């Protein structure tokens, strides 16, 4: 039995190539009511969690069975894995928090590679208290000669106590910690040549032991 969390691509192996994916951030809100004047009243305030689905390319039958077995492990209680946006092919860089404005969420990073460009749409991840924080840049910047960059912004906002000065971060094609959505794995269908349509849904977890 593997030690969780596992890196999804490493654990599933070289056959785990994307055919299609969704990769999205939940709203954390619900429509509670709509007034006679057409105003939509939204309620909620729950955690905004990343979620998505992954469909793998068609596999030879023996490879599909191997994939099924590994996914069975990931569907069990207590299993978790790291997954990222597979359309992001830019690699990762590391750095540290330099400063964070608690009121606005605007922050600076240090210890980055000079000249590296952080783009809106890149991802930011860091570990704290047994958890993995995962965010997406809405405002980026170019790292200066001293390895510093700011003023940066991300969604969702940092949770209280998570982002602190000197904490190490990963920038770019970073990954979040996730679990399988129960009942949402499709093992695919097979013809004489291959098995296709193997799909599963996942959702970010903030628990240390999901």
Question: What are the language-model segments listed below?
Answer:
Residues 1-210:
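Extracellular/virion structural assembly segments
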